[in-house]
Design a protein with these regions (language model features):
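FNR/FR-type flavoprotein reductase catalytic core
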Residues: 4-5, 78-213
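Ferredoxin-reductase
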Residues: 2-90, 148-150, 178
């Protein structure tokens, strides 16, 4: 961390995408049209608004994306309620990055990777997944096990089905908690699905999500 990470920068929320009923993805740029700072996969940043408050959020976009920065945020409190109510063009402040991030250039390099996520827990992992996709030659097979309450609650579902599922060397396993009309995939909780899949224990595992503490 250096002194620059402590200084809030004014940014513009240029786009807001509704991912699920309670998750939106916010795209930000400086007033000059640039990313506010560089980051590593897995790092986070503080977003604040005077008179409302501030909160720490995972940076969802990959560092390889040089055009903008994104945050996928679940509505679950004062700051997130306010964020979910704003419109594109709103200015906020951001500072960071914070955290160590994932060791993508050391421990993960050359390894077979297993990502396990539940609900909004995919948001912090999306950054490193897309980083590994960009530098595909540096990593082995990539397995992704992801689940949520329903199909409607699967974050980044379009990106998963349109991009991740179609790439060689990437295996995606989706599940939802309960039967749902129109869903022909796996049904069940993520921890149980992982046990069914019986993944190779030699894989390097990256995991995020409250429902996964019993794995």
């Amino acid at each position: 961390m250096n002194s620059e990470t402590l200084i809030p920068q004014v940014v513009v929320v240029t786009d807001i995408m509704k991912d699920t009923p309670d998750v939106k993805t916010f795209r930000i740029l400086t007033p000059e049209g640039k990313k506010p700072f560089d980051h590593m996969p897995g790092q986070c940043a503080m977003i604040s608004m005077p008179g409302v408050g501030e909160a720490l959020f995972s940076i969802t976009s990959s560092p390889t994306n040089t055009e903008f920065m994104e945050f996928s945020i679940k509505k679950c409190g004062c700051v997130t309620d306010w964020l979910h109510a704003i419109e594109p063009g709103q200015q906020v402040t951001v500072r960071g990055p914070y955290g160590n991030g994932f060791p993508v250039e050391t421990e993960l390099k050359g390894k077979d990777l297993l990502f396990i996520a539940g609900g909004i827990g995919l948001a912090p992992l999306r950054s490193v997944i897309n980083y590994c996709r960009h530098y595909r030659e540096n990593y082995g097979t990539i397995d992704i096990v992801y689940g949520s309450r329903s199909k409607d609650d699967l974050v980044d579902y379009q990106e998963i089905t349109d991009e991740w599922c179609r790439e060689d060397g990437i295996n995606v396993y989706l599940t939802i908690d309960r039967e749902q009309e129109g869903w022909d995939g796996h049904v069940g909780f993520v921890p149980n699905y992982v046990k069914e899949l019986n993944p190779d224990v030699s894989k390097t595992v990256l995991m995020c999500g409250l429902s996964l503490i019993h794995i």
